[in-house]
């Protein structure tokens, strides 16, 4: 089954926040993405609200509930108490936990699962008790022991950090090596019964090879490249192009 496409709206929100104006409207572009066949929406509400604002979350939750009940809402973030309360209020289908420092421009590494196992176990239990699926951001470095530790936290999935693979857009041999490591990490998770998501710097060009190497890839969340392409092709056509890259459309 092809990977589901979840459209990350942070870049849309960042553009909106350049002015004290309500456009571009994050909810409107979320609706366009879902109308074009995206299966979910992803947001990463950072503490300083420089991209998605906390006030966006109930609007996006209502959009999905009222108009696209089969779609999923995925909220990413570092599991601070404030973040966990946001998730408990918004009730996303999935929470993706990332080890970000608040000052980071973007997520750029996975969890050190050995160092944070106890902390993550408690957080995962809390979120799952509230009815949410939990995914943990993981380095795609082929470390099977790290994946086993992630499994031990009780998490349902890992999200492969695909940034190193995405950065090899002009270096095919290096891209092949990174893809092999991602595949090994995914295989380890799959063997343990975990679901596998992917995200970061995925594009129309590099997504097909990832989907071919990891045929059980459950979901990809894509924002930067998708938003950039939408400037040229429009949101609806861009979503269709990414769905084709996932193998969903012929």
From Swiss-Prot:
UniProt-listed GO biological process terms: pyridoxine biosynthetic process
Query: Which reaction is recorded as catalysed by this protein?
Result: 3-amino-2-oxopropyl phosphate + 1-deoxy-D-xylulose 5-phosphate = pyridoxine 5'-phosphate + phosphate + 2 H2O + H(+)
A Pfam family that this protein carries is PdxJ
| Gene3D superfamilies linked to this entry | Aldolase class I
Q: How does it assemble?
A: Homooctamer; tetramer of dimers.
The record's comment on protein family reads: Belongs to the PNP synthase family.
What's the name of the protein?
A: Pyridoxine 5'-phosphate synthase
């Amino acid at each position: 089954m092809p990977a589901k496409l979840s459209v990350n709206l942070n870049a849309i929100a960042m553009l909106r926040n350049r002015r004290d104006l309500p456009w571009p409207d994050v909810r409107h572009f979320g609706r366009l993405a879902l109308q074009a066949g995206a299966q979910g929406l992803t947001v990463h509400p950072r503490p300083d609200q420089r991209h998605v604002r906390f006030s966006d979350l109930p609007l996006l939750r209502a959009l999905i509930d009222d108009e696209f009940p089969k779609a999923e809402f995925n909220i990413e973030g570092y599991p601070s108490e404030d973040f966990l309360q946001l998730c408990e209020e918004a009730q996303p289908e999935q929470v993706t936990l990332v080890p970000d420092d608040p000052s980071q421009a973007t997520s750029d590494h996975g969890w050190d699962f050995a160092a944070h196992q106890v902390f993550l176990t408690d957080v995962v239990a809390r979120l799952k008790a509230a009815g949410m699926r939990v995914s943990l951001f993981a380095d795609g470095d082929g470390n099977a022991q790290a994946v086993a530790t992630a499994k031990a936290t009780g998490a349902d999935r890992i999200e492969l950090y695909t940034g190193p693979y995405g950065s090899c857009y002009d270096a095919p041999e290096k891209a092949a090596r990174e893809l092999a490591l991602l595949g090994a990490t995914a295989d380890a998770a799959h063997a343990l019964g975990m679901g596998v998501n992917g995200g970061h710097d995925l594009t129309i060009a590099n997504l097909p090879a990832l989907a071919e190497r990891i045929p059980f890839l459950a979901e990809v969340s894509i924002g930067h490249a998708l938003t950039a392409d939408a400037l040229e092709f429009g949101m609806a056509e861009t979503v269709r192009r990414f769905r084709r890259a996932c193998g969903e459309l012929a």
